[in-house]
């Protein structure tokens, strides 16, 4: 058939790794070849806010959120592979982007 690229993102890397392991197991059961998981760079978003509502600009608090990402390439995907991926129950915390690529 064709190649399928999956990009997965989550705030918690443990949930992300469990989801990736479930996808890899489901794809290997169908007999398709898989490349990855490839760990992508972690994106860190930092936010700085004032502690006081009015004055005292020297007193600030910093927060950060980390976005972990993994990428999987499924080579020579069959209709069984696509069917098993659609039936897979994934964690709601994980964002999955699916892109079908040419041969």
UniProtKB/Swiss-Prot annotation:
GO cellular component, one term: ribonucleoprotein complex
GO MF term list: structural constituent of ribosome; tRNA binding
InterPro entries (alphabetical): Ribosomal_uS10, Ribosomal_uS10_CS, Ribosomal_uS10_dom, Ribosomal_uS10_dom_sf
GO process terms (BP): translation
Keywords: Ribonucleoprotein, Ribosomal protein
Gene3D superfamilies, alphabetized: Ribosomal protein S10 domain
Function: Involved in the binding of tRNA to the ribosomes.
Binding partners and assembly: Part of the 30S ribosomal subunit.
Annotated family: Belongs to the universal ribosomal protein uS10 family.
PANTHER family: 30S RIBOSOMAL PROTEIN S10 FAMILY MEMBER
The protein, known as: Small ribosomal subunit protein uS10
Gene it is expressed from: rpsJ
């Amino acid at each position: 058939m064709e190649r399928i690229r999956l990009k997965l993102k989550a705030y918690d890397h443990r949930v992300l790794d469990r989801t990736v392991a479930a996808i890899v197991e489901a794809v290997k059961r169908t007999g398709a070849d898989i490349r990855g998981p490839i760990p992508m760079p972690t994106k860190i978003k930092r936010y700085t806010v004032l502690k006081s509502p009015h004055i005292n600009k020297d007193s600030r608090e910093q927060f950060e959120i980390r976005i972990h990402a993994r990428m999987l390439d499924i080579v020579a995907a069959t209709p069984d592979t696509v069917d098993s991926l659609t039936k897979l129950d994934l964690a709601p915390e994980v964002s999955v982007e699916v892109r079908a690529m040419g041969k």
